[in-house]
């Protein structure tokens, strides 16, 4: 393996054995690819905006005199970049301009003579853009559009599994689902008639649809039935025999031919009889005359002389009819072939139930069903039926739908229109009848071949089309009404409906969600989430058990582990690590192809449909050196079932062991030893981990930590290789390698880092450089760590030394005992940033003012404000402190005579304003880290706003100047090299001003050209930077676009440092969660023989019943990993030579039979020193899931670092110094602090707000509510007979309004009595009864 310079700084020991065939693909590609497809120009017009425009345009006017055509579109540059949008609270979007062509025809001239053509670019609203990390900034907050898993368009055959009818009879149905348009359902009823429903309305006999398609009874019967021919010969009735049709029937008469009896009457006809009949080549047999009675005529039989119908199609024969037929001279009679086994007479029966006789009556019947109450006319009925399934504007199966439809009804091709035609409808009915006849299977709707993914791009396109269709109507009208000579395309288009539709989708759709930004993993998982809910999807209430369950086709596509607990379980899923979407929106997963038992490195992506019948081996199948299977029988999957298969039959093999699960689940080491329920909790809780002050890489990881950290976008990653030129806390400058340069550029990359900004969850986002000046970097190296990353690896928590033992009941019921040392070392200290904003509005009584001059407020309260009334940066504030002083005008009040007198004497002007300042919420204290003032255009900026503006300008100028100097330096260095090469002396150059170098003339023409080129570049660079600064200056100084009626907004950012404390929730990665019960002095904690105390004591009883044994293995492995670090520290202490370190490290990295090859000898001395420095805290270990370190390796590593192989140490009680009875499991576990902090939850109320109707106290911390004394709590008081307590609870402590005010007065007076009155809910009940029209009144006792 080749490690880059930064990867060599800390090499993670990998215990994986299987070779890595395929790297994990870019984790956010599902979002980015989909959106790119949406906004990129698509010449075919299949996808995205292009498809939407082409589907709506051209728009013809009603009279046909003009039309509006679409030419092309382009997206301009967005006005603000992502960061500016977040600060200003606006949407990151680009204006969409569309080139339209208005064609006007000359109505007097012959048809299609063009009179006038006008082209123009028209503004069509703003399209929100996706940031590089797959999010959208909507109104200043980052949002994610979650992909939706919905039922694919196409046709589905299903059954009710015998649940509808009491008899338990299975009723089959077929449903044609288009991408947009009306649903078409066919279904059987218990009497085996076939019915049709349109859009789930009332059912009609299915043959009505066929009649509406202009089919006669005869044609309908012809489509669905085979015929049986009878011949009348000399008073006997001969039947044409197809032996196969008789199988399973009971003979009602002797079947004989040529004097030989084949089957006697009353016997069942078997396959043996049929073989004999076929062998003897019997084609006709004689049947009794009454055999034809009850059979059904296949077409009309007419008496040719009189013209009367003897028997109509679909009518049953009687003996009389037979006589009439032979009289009319019919020698051959055709009847329908039906039987009870596999040729049911369903359509024939349905036709009898169908009251319609021709096309018109059928159309009228459909019209009545769709539009009840409207009088049907022939034209209306025809137009409605036509628009239901045959009009491209109203109905579209989409390419996916057509593909699924054709494959479902057995066509080989994918071609076909987006609308249905008559053969489509007939084929669906045929297949449904076949299924009812026992031929073919019903579909499994939970199969991933029948459910597809709708991602951002597709949903945005649909919304955009909705907006366009609204515009289309308006355009049509304007085209018909307006004066076409004067009108331009932009007069026709109103962009409002389009931007409204798009805005509504991004702002308030159920699938547009506030991004979960707790840590990098939660961001990545949120973007990879697949939801079955949302518009056009399921609802929680309706979703049954089957939809939520894990299906065999989820393998490698959707994670079977990561899903929420609670009502959404199974409806919200996560994409598996290697899964991706194909062009139709179905999920695919990669497999290695196996050819003749040889496993190749060729990787094929298969969707659930394609995977169908392949035999697929698992990733951990044992292979030989040559890449063939070692065992005779291999565990493999086929059609969703696992079993043993001979090795010659294997066709594919999994690519990786973590292919099955999602990213979050593959971060859990030793997942294979955990119970599924706990693994689910572990995967979900990692997403809730709060980034700690100092990130600490997990000692025991799984090897994909780096992928998550890099792909999440929280780190700064090198775009190109080079050498680090300079580094400070907020900027990294890299001189790019010569071979990666684009001709004609300065060759300097500048990375600006994000400092202390607030995330969506109020955690802190901050980037810290990890590289030093002079270090080489390659493309893709991590230059700066973000939140929860450590040297480019995901680091959600801290490695804690833990012991599994009870400790005085402090770890009862999953509680956690923590050492004080953890608090002192700030191991779990987190920073939370809150944004508090103060808005000054224009009110009816005058405008509010932000000022330090606040009535009735003492000096002390104003001490932290500046003269503009805004708190200064760096102030430490606590609950109740004023952050922004604001006064609101209040209406003139009537003064009492006394007040008037005082005013007259002291001449004091009435203070007609009230204090409405922004204060710190009660439970919060912290430091002010930033203040931003937004002022409306045209309102004068206050002093503070101007100060902030000056500061921003200064910063911007400094940034831009520095950037310019860096780039200028790079360019001038190239000039110097050129000049020196041309023979100019260096001394002379150093004496000159550097800019004069560009004016030197050289003799060599080629060199002179080069120099002139560089000079040109220099001028361009300067001009570009001047322009850049001007743009920046304009943005900073211009007024802000605030909501109507708002004059000024002041945003104050408050940083709160939260140490860990009792009541905080912590968890491991294996679903082992608990709450801190006590923080114990370090001297009381158990310690080992070396005197090392443990940090955390966990309850051993939390392990066996929960079956998450992975945590025990993690603890042992963690102990060994830390042991390596201790050993290195010991060697450093003894000041051993470098070669001994090399030998020790080589021994460590060579341990176990793994795929990883680390050659310490190949590292330089400096690299080894850096590695040693980074391994002092312990050796990071990767144990990939399902391919992790075996027990033997853990023991081997423990032995190498001189620790007991049992992983158990002798511990001593910190309080007494006595040893505990038996050895205790001690080791290192990766613990997370979850975002469920006691500070956010702790809350108490004495009196507060009450609900308006019931007058009961509100609930919840946000409303300063009380605790609910519910039904069960009432039972408890009843059970104890505590009558007075109960009375108090139900009256004065709840909704007895008079009682509670009196009670409060009494308490204030020191009189502790209560007088219960009438609870308000009783009055509410009275009102409700009266509202039902029953007069109910209270009678007083007196």
Swiss-Prot record:
Kindly state which reaction or reactions the protein catalyses: RNA(n) + a ribonucleoside 5'-triphosphate = RNA(n+1) + diphosphate
The record lists the organism as Aliivibrio fischeri (strain ATCC 700601 / ES114) (Vibrio fischeri)
SUPFAM superfamilies documented for this protein: beta and beta-prime subunits of DNA dependent RNA-polymerase (SSF64484)
Q: Keywords in UniProt for this one? A: DNA-directed RNA polymerase, Nucleotidyltransferase, Transcription, Transferase
A GO term, aspect molecular function:
DNA binding
Q: Which domain of life is it from?
A: Bacteria
Matching InterPro entries: DNA-dir_RNA_pol_bsu_ext_1_sf, DNA-dir_RNA_pol_bsu_external_1, DNA-dir_RNA_pol_su2, DNA-dir_RNAP_su2_dom, DNA-dir_RNAP_su2_hyb_sf, RNA_pol_bsu_bac, RNA_pol_bsu_CS, RNA_pol_bsu_protrusion
List the EC numbers from the record. Answer: 2.7.7.6
Q: What's one GO-annotated cellular component?
A: DNA-directed RNA polymerase complex
Does the record carry Phosphoprotein as a key word?
Answer: no
The protein's job, in short, is: DNA-dependent RNA polymerase catalyzes the transcription of DNA into RNA using the four ribonucleoside triphosphates as substrates.
Q: Which GO terms describe its biological process?
A: DNA-templated transcription
Please give the family membership noted in the entry.
Belongs to the RNA polymerase beta chain family.
Q: What is this protein called?
A: DNA-directed RNA polymerase subunit beta
What does the subunit section of this Swiss-Prot or TrEMBL entry state?
A: The RNAP catalytic core consists of 2 alpha, 1 beta, 1 beta' and 1 omega subunit. When a sigma factor is associated with the core the holoenzyme is formed, which can initiate transcription.
